[in-house]
Amino acid sequence: MKRLLLITLAMLSYIINCNAVVVKSPVDYVNPLVGTASKRELSTGNTYPAIALPWAMNFWTAQTGKMGDGWTYVYGADKIRGIKQTHQPSPWINDYGQFAFMPITGKKVFDEEGRASWFSHKAETATPYYYKVYLADYDATVELSPTSRAASVRITYPTTNEAYFLVDAFDKGSSVTILPDKRTIVGYTTKNSGGVPDNFKNYFILRFDHDFVYKGCLSDGKLIDNQLSATCNHAMAVVGFQTKRGEQINVQVASSFISEEQAFRNLKEVEGKSFEQVKAEGKAEWNKVLGRIEVEDDNVDHLRTFYSCLYRSVLFPRSFYEFDAEGKPIHYSPYNGKVLEGYLFTDTGYWDTFRSLFPLLNLIYPSMNEKMQAGLVNAYRESGFLPEWASPGHRDCMVGNNSASVVADAYIKGLRGYDIETLWKAVVHGANAVHPTISSTGRKGFEYYNRLGYVPYNVGINESVARTLEYAYDDWCIYQLGLKLRKSAKELQPFKERAMNYKNVFDKETCLMRGRNADGSFQKPFNPYKWGDAFTEGNSWHYTWSVFHDPSGLAQLMGGYDKFNTMLDSVFNLPPVFDDTYYGFTIHEIREMQIMHMGNYAHGNQPIQHMIYLYDYSGQPWKVQYWIREVMNRLYTAQPDGYCGDEDNGQTSAWYVFSALGFYPVCPGSTQYMIGTPYFHKAKIHLENGKTITICAENNNDDNRYIQLITMDGQPYPHYYLEHDKLKKGVSLNFMMGERKPI
């Protein structure tokens, strides 16, 4: 009877799967507008449509916000001020090296308010490799297809003798020069939001395929006809054409952080290529990268959400290197202002991305992360510290020393080809020092932490419990890396011991993490719903679970797994109450938790994103399967409001990618992934070594979210974790799904 039931289920699964969509061109399922329906008070991603190649040096976006506004593109806007080259990782960090262009017809009105044109999303096309928009006020259409350091632009003008093309180099010091004989505009911008040396510039070049019938420059808002150059606080260049309806002006654009000469060299990425060729090559590159994961499903919306998240997972960290005349990688250093050999990457905050973004790279795109690790070697050599938030240089943002996790996870999972000994020195140094001017780099409060075993609450160092918990985990990562490198027991002993420091801020009375004073007493009064204060963008209910490396030890502190599970349950059962007095207002992360109707679970921010998977450790995997499916169903879509908080440079997207595949790296630095619940009927992960991970979920639908049986390569698999080394060899995982939790 049981065998007959299994055969029947298998036949039903086959019938259902016959309706599954087989994805042939994954980039066609990407919506770059996901997360753009955001504002300062409420984030649905805080993204912009990044028109770019994977890990490109330059991104492009339509600009709806004012110059310098971190919300550069907002879905609810109805006017476009320009098409901007951007390097912005988030609205909170803001942009650097940005400039914009704008087609205009009729009157010579070039300030950003006056030139802004109405547009409609119905006349807008946004893909990762191609952007098109109709500028209604000018009856003109803009198209753009990018490469990593250049782009091909095509403008379709109406019939007019006043077809203008504006280049806005923005304020804070800029320069433009028009070269009529070469049909070219060159210039530079110095605009930035910090993290750069005094000699920072982004040099740009624009080359046209039509002669200029008008030339002019604006110096700080004043237009001078026939002026061919301007160097001032805010420089702009304007060239004009006489066009017939449907006539197209082609522009090739490139830039460099190194020099104008290097910008011309970078222009070779599009030289000699038609617009359609650049567009086709961009699409092919995206399909190559996204196609590393094939998924099949009968729900097209699931496919769109998945590939939109995978797209966000392969944008950052951005390349910050270029190629010299001999084809060797070189970079302008945002740490010391020199042009040096080698790779460099930037625009990521490890507080966010150590959790699942870098583990995703290590599994699916390891050769890219090997370059990133080589870039970290250079960052350390050039600044004396590994970055914790880089954009493009060190930025004072967030807490923790999580570069240690990024370094350890890569090496432990087999990445090679870079100077690991220098990175070892870097992580050890960063664990015992703080940057002299950027307090989030290194470890603020390390003296207290090393001596007392925690960062005290009452010594003037904010977010002390968050720091303690993250330092303890980072010490564990350093210890694991040291074991892999066969460092001496004496050298490793401090890190081994300090990995248990999380216990020093655990309050047995409340079973929660709590601020602790220098004399050993716990902070009073204590409100576990209070955001900030001893924690970073969260409260004690969120941060208590930040013991990635020792969930079993945390459970024992609580009194055992029964209490552990009760505490986990409480996160969802509690009302979404909060105390925002530390900030003096309700920060957007609080509001996002409040409105999602999931109790005190705050998936819109990173500290708690791994928490659901902790049920695997405590013997209740069906709760993982229930809640992971709830999060994927309710908190992610492929719409402009598709995230439940900041997307954060690939982290929140990588969470979805892993979770939809059915497993997740709870503890980067270890070799294990915890099993969740597969979202798709079938998925294939094509590894760089030529092996394939095949994941099949029979009888899978929203009701049948519970795993009844797992087999690996045809044999029953009794565990709720997967080993990295086993996955690298290629495996076939089969999940039999059902509507009831297994007994």
Functional labels for PLM-detected ranges:
Residues 1-22:
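Bacterial Sec-dependent N-terminal signal peptides
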Residues 21-358, 362-405, 411-469, 477, ...:
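Accessory carbohydrate-recognition regions in carbohydrate-active enzymes
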Residues 474:
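ATP-dependent phospho-/nucleotidyl transfer catalytic cores
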Residues 697:
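Conserved catalytic core of nucleotide polymerization and phosphodiester-bond processing enzymes
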Residues 706:
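Extracellular attachment/recognition segments
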